[in-house]
Amino acid sequence: MVIEIKIYYHFLLGETMSYFWTVCVPCYNPDERLEKLLDSVVAQNCKDDIEVVIIDDCSTKDYSNILDKFKDKLNIFKYETKLNGGPGPTRQRGIEHSTGEWITFIDQDDVFLPDVFKDVKKQIEEYPTIQTLVNTPFYIVDAVTNQITQYLPNADNWIHGKFYHRENFLLKYNIHFCEDLYSHEDIYFSTLVKGVLNCNKLPYIQCNTPTYNWYTYADSLSHKETETGLNYLEEYFGEYIDSILEPVMQLDEQYKNKDFTAKQLLTLLLFGYFYIQGFLYYNSTNFKRDNITKFRQLLDYTEDCLGLTNDEIIQWTYNNPKDYFDIREKAAGGTGPMIETYSYASFINEVKPQVKNNDS
């Protein structure tokens, strides 16, 4: 999907500047919550270090009145897409139009915590040779009660609370958002990040200071996956598989690192198995059979790529019981508690019966 962009709205304080940070904000019909986000950027008290790149994804209402309030406080660059593409392609346009040395992504209805950029910059200056990624914890917060509902110290499949070196990491290694995914775009991007770090043995900085409040709202597109849970996951199960499978295929072709490839594919098979068990447990009557087909395609690729039989794939789970139960617990976070209709072994063999040679 190709999305054309034009410069639509632009504030710039003073002459052309070189920025340390780019804050990329995908926007669609934002309201006063965008103002709260921008207030949290102003409160960092380092405006000369920061550019705010707003990528508007075909909003149907004008919100220039919100941006006007910040024309003397922030360096804001606004671009407008020609085609509504969702958060993935919109964030990709943000990378392409950013100029900061480091880039971070934030949703239009979330906020940064105080002194984030100063604290993270100190970490970067302590390790000047590490120009890849700064990973930080963040909070999930109920927007109605303003109570923290979850603390995520190391959410590696999320882009939130992370700061990426634009030139020496994202651009150098072609880490990008997929143009064709409407959902799970952050998993696709994060899989590329993990693969590049792992396959090139690159270090990154782990910062222990929380940087970000991720708010849950009933009307937020970016949070509907959490809101609708099981139904969302079942509807977009194919895109979930593709969001990991496609970057793993790219990385396998480029790096030939079978240890990384095997770990990702075998883990993805387990997640797929548990998700399907959840679908069957909660909605067996209207279960989408296409999701079995998608799982079979993943199983076919895993066997072809790694040269493994069904029995060898199943044996991996027996050899890694901690991974098995950790993945089951994480999967239950999306589907809810479940009773497995089939064991992993019987499910694998039913999806793709193992052909056995009989000696005559």
Residue spans for each PLM region:
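Membrane-interface aromatic/basic loop that binds lipid-linked glycans or pyrophosphate carriers
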Residues: L12-L13, M17, F279-S360
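Short, well-formed alpha-helical segments that are part of the catalytic scaffolds
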Residues: P30-A43
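A conserved acidic beta->alpha catalytic loop
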Residues: D56-N65, D107
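Glycine-rich, basic loop-to-helix element that forms the pyrophosphate-binding segment
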Residues: K82-S98
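Short aromatic/hydrophobic "clamp" motif used to bind/position activated sugar donors
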Residues: I103
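Conserved nucleotide-sugar donor-binding catalytic segment
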Residues: Y151-G229
